[in-house]
């Protein structure tokens, strides 16, 4: 495989029934591959993971409202895919574009996603390099060191996995332009 596959970045986002990594479940996953300059190379499948009503009915008010309004709960109910099905389909996509263990896990607050994957999709979690490219870390630095640039940042915040990834890529491009020093 070409060295290009060693420099590409895997962007991933999960939507979950909540934030409890020991008990909550993954309900949606999406991936995007970019080159090292953040240009989109490929978009992966957007997959809803079926969950029974007892899991969906246990969601807190925020998740119930957010995922209900976005249509995600209905997609989850209609889905026939298990977490393992979704894991395998995502891996099949990634293997076409990026060599194993070369890309950090990229996204916003990605540690939470990694913890869910470790428990529910371990093979997928192991496909990534151990490092993370967490845009939320850059945001925290920008808020403290250059707060004046934050008003120019616009995000969609739909809490649908593919939209959230696009937002994360756009956000990092924004920080590259307005936060990082160019020589």
Curated annotation (Swiss-Prot):
Exonuclease domain boundaries: 9-172
Gene Ontology cellular component terms for the protein in this record: cytoplasm
SUPFAM superfamilies from the UniProt entry? Ribonuclease H-like (SSF53098)
Enumerate the subcellular locations listed in this protein's record, separating them with semicolons.
Cytoplasm
Q: Which GO terms describe its molecular function?
A: 3'-5'-RNA exonuclease activity; nucleic acid binding
The record's Pfam families line, in alphabetical order, gives: RNase_T
Record-linked InterPro entries: Exonuclease_RNaseT/DNA_pol3, Oligoribonuclease, RNaseH-like_sf, RNaseH_sf
Q: What is its main location?
A: cytoplasm
- UniProt entry tagged with the keyword Cytoplasm: yes
- Biological process annotations from GO: DNA metabolic process
Show the active-site residues: 130
Work out whether the entry's keyword set contains Electron transport: no
> Which UniProt keywords are given for this protein, alphabetically ordered?
Cytoplasm, Exonuclease, Hydrolase, Nuclease
Q: Which EC class is the enzyme in? A: hydrolase
Q: Which Gene3D superfamilies match?
A: Ribonuclease H-like superfamily/Ribonuclease H (3.30.420.10)
Which EC numbers does the record give? 3.1.15.-
Q: Which domain of life is it from?
A: Bacteria
As for what it does, the entry says: 3'-to-5' exoribonuclease specific for small oligoribonucleotides.
Q: Which PANTHER family match?
A: OLIGORIBONUCLEASE, MITOCHONDRIAL
UniProt family annotation? Belongs to the oligoribonuclease family.
- Please state what the protein is called: Oligoribonuclease
Task: Give the source species.
Answer: Acinetobacter baylyi (strain ATCC 33305 / BD413 / ADP1)
Gene name in the database record: orn
